[in-house]
């Protein structure tokens, strides 16, 4: 490229200061420099004013021409000398053929101790090599580092906000338990603080749509809802159908675009036509649930604005409206532990649901019904058999029907439950059979596949995960992971297999990891150690059977196979069964 003072040599050759200030574009994204000798201020993309070049800022009293004026002149009178391998042309007119090399006037090679020629015609006092080497050092080590630093800063600035959200995944204030990415909609994730404004899902098929359950009604999505909220939405809201339409007509029309979901209880397609409560006449509105979200998106793209039996229909993603928007109740509702408000809430009636109350299994309705009702008072959907209490004790079934119709999970889920001995479920999850806030062997939890426990109790479950534990208790589960747990004996942890935050055989993550306690550990495979405790033998930060921070016989350390520990009997920094200075030190140099 022409007139380019390029760093094509990746720091091998430095562009020395050009006597005539040609504003060559510098190849590492640096702004082109032009110099004060021609009335142009030095411009640098790094905010540097190369003050060391004060001796180069020639006062060109006799030459007020612009830089372009020099391009048209033969520069033979300037005693240019190409140095070593730079190979610049003497003539700027031919500089276009130099392939990225800059035309340089009296330009020494990188590291060459030459002083510049005194140009009597230009009254230039050129700096010696001392100044030049200082410039080279700055230009080489600082300018390029500046570029890297600024590019990193720019990169970080783009991601800082998102990263902050990710950091709060299990965060102090973030009660989006089980939620991927800080209470998103993964594995039953709730809104960011778990109490969010009516958009959080209560669990479901790994963050499935907020369809099935809760005390809400459907409506069109508002402008405040972002497009990303619909990535798992498989239900559409249709308006303008007309009064004399039937579910069969709606089904025939929309099944052209995808498979309409079937209610497993009734065997009917999941299509709900709305009627006016006062007149009983159809409102011309309906919801249609497809088997998969892409079909719903395709139905919106294709049918929105199309004609249906002589009427132009409007098709959009369905969203639920809270009870107070439908003219409902007092807006009571408790908000503890993320609150019911974010999950479809019960604020319409105020307070907690009573024993025996049940959620309509119709995904287009989701109305909460009194225990005495045998059909939904909104859509007349028959009451599921498994929602009926047995023996006067309704404790074991949670708030929802079979698997909550929340796509493998739900508000209560199969075998759900709020508490008590062997209390069944929890807020969601497939066979989230533990759950409950407390009680002996409280199996389930807020969500996840077969999520074991709950807030506490023996063999307590957890917020999510596979057979996850709970906040405490023997063999407690945890936020996620297999048999995880927050604390207690054999407690699980935030994630991992049999992880745990504390307690006996606890773990923060990993396989049988533990944060502290007996056989605790920070992570790793069977990392039995941890921050302290008796036989804190394995753990450490990671590795297979790696050590731990302290405790008696704390075998481990930061990593490695059966690595040592930070302190305690048989301790050590790392290595295979290693102490700090034992005879196996030759094994410590191998990579972990």
UniProtKB/Swiss-Prot annotation:
The Low complexity compositionally biased stretches are 1-21, 28-91, 104-129, 140-150
Q: Where is the composition biased (Basic and acidic residues)?
A: 151-175, 214-224, 579-592
What are the protein's UniProt keywords? Acetylation, ADP-ribosylation, Chromosomal rearrangement, Cytoplasm, DNA-binding, Isopeptide bond, Metal-binding, Methylation, Nucleus, Phosphoprotein, Proto-oncogene, Repeat, RNA-binding, Ubl conjugation, Zinc, Zinc-finger
Q: SUPFAM superfamilies annotated for this entry? A: Ran binding protein zinc finger-like (SSF90209), RNA-binding domain, RBD (SSF54928)
Q: Where is this cross-link: Glycyl lysine isopeptide (Lys-Gly) (interchain with G-Cter in SUMO2)?
A: 265, 268
N6-acetyllysine (modified residue): where?
268
Q: Name one GO biological process term.
A: mRNA stabilization
Coarsely, its chief localization is: nucleus
* Region spans: Disordered: 1-237, 324-356, 373-592
Kindly list the positions at which Dimethylated arginine occurs in this protein: 483
Task: Name positions with the PTM Omega-N-methylarginine.
Answer: 206, 431, 459, 475, 562
- PTM field: Dimethylated by PRMT1 at Arg-206 to asymmetric dimethylarginine. The methylation may favor nuclear localization and positive regulation of TAF15 transcriptional activity. ADP-ribosylated during genotoxic stress.
Q: Write down any Gene Ontology CC term.
A: nucleus
Give the location in the cell: Nucleus; Cytoplasm
Report the stretches of sequence that form zinc fingers (RanBP2-type).
354-385
Among its keywords, does the record have Ubl conjugation? yes
Gly residues biased stretches: 176-187, 341-350, 415-578
At the top level, the lineage of the source is Eukaryota
Q: What SMART domains does the record tag this protein with?
A: RRM, ZnF_RBZ
- According to its UniProt entry, what is the function of this protein? RNA and ssDNA-binding protein that may play specific roles during transcription initiation at distinct promoters. Binds to ssRNA containing the consensus sequence 5'-AGGUAA-3'. Can enter the preinitiation complex together with the RNA polymerase II (Pol II).
Family, similarity comment: Belongs to the RRM TET family.
Known disease link: A chromosomal aberration involving TAF15/TAF2N is found in a form of extraskeletal myxoid chondrosarcomas (EMC). Translocation t(9;17)(q22;q11) with NR4A3.
Tell me how this protein assembles.
Answer: Belongs to the RNA polymerase II (Pol II) transcriptional multiprotein complex, together with the TATA-binding protein (TBP) and other TBP-associated factors (TAF(II)s). Binds SF1.
Please report the name of this protein according to its UniProt entry. Answer: TATA-binding protein-associated factor 2N
